[in-house]
Swiss-Prot record:
It catalyses: S-methyl-5'-thioinosine + phosphate = 5-(methylsulfanyl)-alpha-D-ribose 1-phosphate + hypoxanthine. GO terms for biological process: L-methionine salvage from methylthioadenosine; purine ribonucleoside salvage. Phosphate binds at residues 8, 44-45, 174. This is Probable S-methyl-5'-thioinosine phosphorylase. It holds the Pfam family PNP_UDP_1. It comes from Methanocaldococcus jannaschii (strain ATCC 43067 / DSM 2661 / JAL-1 / JCM 10045 / NBRC 100440) (Methanococcus jannaschii). It is an enzyme of class 2 (transferase). Catalyzes the reversible phosphorylation of S-methyl-5'-thioinosine (MTI) to hypoxanthine and 5-methylthioribose-1-phosphate. Involved in the breakdown of S-methyl-5'-thioadenosine (MTA), a major by-product of polyamine biosynthesis. Catabolism of (MTA) occurs via deamination to MTI and phosphorolysis to hypoxanthine.
Length: 252
């Protein structure tokens, strides 16, 4: 089973349009299930996009996907660019992350047992290679590097960006803690970032939501093509590090 975390536009390519609510011990998650293609679409911000990044119930979302039998997750994340050569309209495939969040529930192991999950390769290496091959096949421009996750919902200041650009390549608000929670449940996770704007201080203008939404709309068909190719890839048995992530991570 494949999980897609993204927006309502992706529902167009699924065979199934009935929204379902999945109850978990961490809360509820809203999904659309395409049983024919074994795909689950999860709306990160809610069906009406009314949940801000810092209020998303990340644990309920990831746990719901696990409960439904999802093994591989493709997450769609909108980001701002920290580098001039990573232009709005390009894609970005993270290979690492740095996070500056403050209030998020970020682990499934607050009690019961102590788990130190390895984050040497936080994004599934197998899925990253597959995603890059799909982007290459479609001749879609993309970059690779470090995703910086901030708390939101505000945009970052110029001084913050001046620091972040020394450490990372793009900045966003939704990529963490999804990536860690997925690894804790031994699921494969990869992120397809769509670059919507230059970050504050990189851009010569003030940042607006209209600018972001306009670029998302402009990239929508490309995003849908990548998602469709990912769904139809024809995955075999998992041979990556993700499936055994807890093997050497649990104390006691």
């Amino acid at each position: 089973m494949i999980g897609i975390i993204g927006g309502t536009g992706i529902a167009e390519i699924l065979k199934g349009d009935k929204e379902e609510i999945i109850n978990t011990k961490y809360g509820k998650a809203r999904v659309i299930i395409d049983k024919e293609n074994e795909v689950v679409l999860l709306f990160r911000h809610g069906v009406r996009h009314n949940i801000p990044p810092h209020k998303i119930n990340y644990r309920a979302n990831i746990y719901a996907l696990k409960k439904l039998g999802v093994e591989r997750i493709l997450a769609i994340n909108s980001v701002g660019s920290l580098k001039e050569d990573l232009k709005p309209g390009m894609f970005f495939v993270p290979n690492d992350f740095i996070e500056f969040t403050k209030k998020r529930e970020e682990t499934f192991y607050d009690e019961g047992k102590v788990v130190h999950i390895d984050m040497t390769d936080p994004y599934c290496p197998e899925l990253r290679n597959i995603l890059k091959s799909i982007l290459d096949k479609n001749n879609f421009s993309y970059g690779e590097g470090v995703y910086v996750c901030t708390e939101g919902p505000r945009f970052e200041t110029k001084k913050e960006i001046a620091i972040y650009k020394n450490w990372g390549d793009v900045v966003g608000m939704t990529g963490y803690p999804e990536v860690v929670l997925a690894r804790e449940l031994e699921m494969c996770y990869v992120s397809l970032c769509n670059i919507t704007n230059y970050a504050c201080g990189i851009s010569k203008n003030i940042l607006t939501v209209d600018e972001v939404l306009e670029k998302i709309k402009e990239m929508e068909n490309k995003i849908l093509k990548v998602v469709e190719d990912f769904i139809n890839y024809g995955f075999g048995e998992r041979k990556c590090i993700c499936k055994d992530a807890l093997k050497h991570a649990v104390i006691g």
